Amino acid sequence: MVGIKDIAREAGVSIATVSNVLHGKRNMSDKTREKILAIAKELGYELPKIRIKEKSSDNKTIVVNFSDFDTNFYLNILHGISDYAYSKDYDIMVCTSRNAEKYMSDVYSAGCINIDYRCEDSMLIKAAENNYPIIVLDREINHSGIKSVIVNNYDAEKEMVETLIKSGYERFAYLSGMDTDDNKERYRAFRDALSAHGITFHRRDYYEGNWREKSGTQAARLLMLSEHMPQVLVCANDMMAIGAMRKFREAGLRVPEDIAVCGFDDAFVSKYMGLTTVEVPNYERGFLAAQSLVELIEGTGSYESLKIGARIKWRTSTLVKTS
């Protein structure tokens, strides 16, 4: 009687590899799998009756690729996603960037919402090439099978900086976040606003952060050691701005009298800190992302990008004339 040892010997592979192929697992190359199946047939081996999970129209699981568990910023997005998904009887599977690729397949899920800036475009495109619906919330990808639901960072940031200029601020410093599309758009708006009003921005006044409060603290420390103290520090997100504000106050500086600070995102704690910021409608962003994905899954949606507006929240960390 022919056994898997015989097949493994003929194919020149391990017994475990043969067992995986015969039981429908796909953790090997197509060439190896086809070779093993051909040898099994040639030797007269009776293949086990297995049930391989195939794509099903009944698959109602959505993958949410989310890795930034250290911040509350994304919680409202997740609430929006879950509220819409559950209203349509879809389940949610939260993945990290390490295992998302495995579950971004119609064997496991019906589609994916990506909120992880560390997830490579190439991985998303690879999944989309297999007619797998994908929504991205942090970037625009030039692919017909990927839809973007993004925030209009530029207009609100530019308006905020221009209002600061009109209120008398002339010396600016900027604290950037990670190298993402959102960060680039916010910085571009900042520079364009200064240029439009004839204000020169010096490289010495540019500080690099990583979205975290600690990087705001570090930037504030460096800024206070500088010989060129700005009138206002514009931060690419709220957590860095909050870190800077706390460090300034710890050092005895008054905010906004000695230095003004503003952020972006309107994090939960920002209103308690009196931080001027740009409010991003994250709940609505998540809700619309889930709605868009379900429509794509069910064949009624469009892959056209969706851009959401944002608005300024003026608070006590800046002295401005808004009328």
Where do the model's predicted regions map?
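Periplasmic-binding protein-like
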Residues: V63, S109-D116, A173-S176, Y206, ...
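N-terminal helix-turn-helix DNA-binding module of bacterial transcription factors
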Residues: M1-S57, D182, T322
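Alpha-helical recognition/docking segments in bacterial nutrient-uptake
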Residues: S57-E162, L225, S323
